[in-house]
A protein has these predicted regions:
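Short acidic/histidine-rich active-site segments
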Residues: 84-96
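Extended substrate/RNA-proximal surfaces in nucleic-acid metabolism proteins
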Residues: 1-80, 99-104, 143-146, 176-182
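Alpha-helix capping and helix-loop boundary segments enriched in small/acidic/polar residues
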Residues: 61-65, 116-119, 139, 172
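Catalytic nucleotidyl-transfer cores of nucleotide-processing enzymes
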Residues: 85, 101-103, 107-111
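Non-catalytic structural connector segments
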Residues: 45, 136-207, 212
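Histidine-centered active-site/metal-ligand motif
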Residues: 13, 92, 204
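Phosphate/diphosphate-binding loops
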Residues: 107, 114-151
Length: 214
């Protein structure tokens, strides 16, 4: 709470405390306390949490219908406590085929289940509406489109760095860059430079135009 000012806090994925509390069937009073802490509640596509179907630790999750029921409970809690419910992808990579990179990273960290990747890619609006059609078309549109935009509208657009890039100013940096580029080009291709000269010139020009000096 000390650092809450200026932040919007969502209930997160299945690893979040609200989802975990629902899995444990904690008392309603505790659920209410958790819900009231958040600015908005989140639900994810079924595939994100399908790993629980084969996980003995989650004995109350035995089918996709059980996963749907958890999401329905979160939606009802949003209605009860006047909290917007937002359908999120819990994105870890852009496209479905990119899961291989996360697999490699997780395998390198020693995860035994690295090959069992959840579909944590960025879905389109149409894909998300299809994912939550079991909530009914109106509610699906509310959690996928309406509430998502409400949250987005509350977020200020800002950049962590200045727009002018603030490159360092170094005397003769343009000449230094040109000398380095052509010296390396001659080392690679000899005295007579082929069409690669055009590429070198273009690279140097773009670096100069964008202020990325040495």
């Amino acid at each position: 709470k000390k650092y809450r000012d200026g932040l919007l806090v969502g209930s997160a994925c299945e690893a979040g405390e609200l989802y975990q509390a629902l899995l444990r069937n904690v008392p309603d009073q505790e659920i209410a306390r958790l819900v009231n802490f958040y600015d908005y509640l989140e639900i994810q596509p079924l595939g994100n949490n399908a790993f629980m179907l084969a996980d003995e630790k989650h004995d109350m999750i035995n089918s996709e219908e059980d996963l749907k029921e958890i999401n329905r409970k979160i939606v009802k809690l949003g209605e009860q406590f006047k909290k917007p419910v937002v359908a999120t992808c819990d994105v870890h990579f852009m496209d479905p085929q990119d899961e291989v990179y996360r697999r490699i990273i997780m395998a390198g960290k020693g995860f035994e289940d690295a090959d069992n990747q959840a579909p944590l890619y960025l879905r389109t609006t149409e894909e998300m509406l299809a994912e939550f059609e079991y909530l009914g078309s109106d509610k699906a549109e509310e959690v996928v489109i309406t509430n998502t935009n409400k949250i987005a509208d509350r977020i200020d657009v800002m950049a962590p760095v200045r727009p002018d890039k603030c490159p360092p100013v170094i005397p003769d940096s343009d000449k230094t860059l040109t000398d380095i580029c052509y010296r390396r080009a001659h080392e690679l291709y000899g005295d007579e430079l082929p069409k690669i000269v055009e590429a070198v010139s273009y690279t140097h020009l773009r670096a100069h135009e964008t202020g990325r000096n040495l």
